[in-house]
Every structure is written in C-alpha cells, then in structure tokens.
Amino acid sequence: MTLVTQKAPNFIAPAILKNGKIMNNFDLKKYSNGQITVLFFWPMDFTFVCPSEIIEFNKTFEAFEKRNVKIVGVSIDSVFVHQAWQNTFPENGGIGKIKFPMVSDIKHEIQKSYHIEHPELNIALRASFLIDENWIIRHQVVNDLPFGRNIDEMIRMIDALNFHNKYGEVCPVNWKHGQEGMKASQEGVSSYLKKYFS
C-alpha cells in the first residue's frame, strides 16, 4: 500500500537520541518541527544488511543536514538493544555512535501504521519515506529483506522536492541537482523532449 500524497502517521515511542540518551516519549512530528524528514525502517538490529544502511545514513548525515532535513530510523528492537548495537564496533557487527534518533517500535504499531510489516515475519521491510514540511509523504520506497536501499537516491529525491517547491517545475527522468527541470505544460514537455530526446 502506498502512502504517497497522504499525511504521515505520527507516533510517540521510546528512542535513543544522538547524544546516547534514552527518551521514552519521542514524538516524530514534534522532532521534525516543520522540516523535511526522512523516516526509514529496518528489520532488526544485529543482522546483516541493516548495519550497512545505518552506517551509510550516518556517513551522509551532513548531506541531509545541509538540506535542512531530519533523519529518523525505526525498528522493533528495544532502545536497550539499539544502545548495545551502537556500543558495538562495526568490525564486530555493530554500528558505532549514530547522529540521528533510533526509535523502538517494540509493539509493532509504527510499522503497521506505515503498512510495511512483513506478512510472515512480523518485522519491518526496508522502507523509506520522504515527508515534506506540510507532513505529506512525497516519496516512498520499500525493499524486500535481502536488498539494501540507495541512500543517494533519497538525497536526489530531496533535491527534486526542493527544486519543485522553489521553481514549480517538474523533474524528468534521471533528474539531478543542477540540471534543468521541465515546465508542467504541453509547451514545456515539447521543448524539453526536443532539447534532450530529439
């Protein structure tokens, strides 16, 4: 089920913050505070593909921060398991210190509200949601468990959202930051296709 164009479900749940402290009533909407937010889910801590994704989000954190974008991650593990995972070095299967909140969905309520629960295993699929300033989901991608997500694609989508908001133009195939957009009109598409596809 796609949630694109719909209001993002809010939640209040325990989380471990970037300073390592545990917050029992982390409020997603309050934390986002009107900023674009990337909300992503992973199946479980101390597994296989998951640490590579979280470490990559952490490595590219500044790229999100300079775009004024918040990152929040969620899994069904407790905050104490999140904490133990952060306290484990990557060479031992851990993730080290993380610069964004890691939420505990121990009751599975959050993954159900976003409709990304695995039908048999009752864990989250690898889902990412781009939530805009008006709390609308503008982009969603869901991968099956064996396949890691593309962090660069999320950054590209943030750039596309910002471009559209600023100029009112749409972003054609393979659009990247710095490239020309397309006016959403018959004249606009004709001009663009003539320039790039003729």
Swiss-Prot record:
It comes from Buchnera aphidicola subsp. Schizaphis graminum (strain Sg). InterPro entries: AhpC/TSA, Peroxiredoxin, Peroxiredoxin_AhpC-typ, Peroxiredoxin_C, Thioredoxin-like_sf, Thioredoxin_domain. GO terms for cellular component: cytosol. Keywords: Antioxidant, Cytoplasm, Disulfide bond, Oxidoreductase, Peroxidase, Redox-active center. This is Alkyl hydroperoxide reductase C. It is found in: Cytoplasm. One of its GO terms (molecular function) is NADH-dependent peroxiredoxin activity. Belongs to the peroxiredoxin family. AhpC/Prx1 subfamily. It is an enzyme of class 1 (oxidoreductase).
